Amino acid sequence: MQLPATGTEHERTEKDTIIISNLRKIVEKRYAENNREKQKSGKLRELRRGFKTF
């Protein structure tokens, strides 16, 4: 999809690239943390279910 030209486009500089990669790292880290939390809570839920069946 091509966005209309607004006159505010600029070449991606080295600084922009560094900022983008840093943001990407932060997002990936948070995503991994969230996944870990979800997996933990899922395991706890399974354990609780197991106890209820006894």
Swiss-Prot record:
Give the species this sequence originates from: Acidianus two-tailed virus
Which domain of life does this protein belong to? Viruses
Q: Where is this region: Disordered?
A: 34-54
Supply the name of the protein.
Uncharacterized protein ORF54
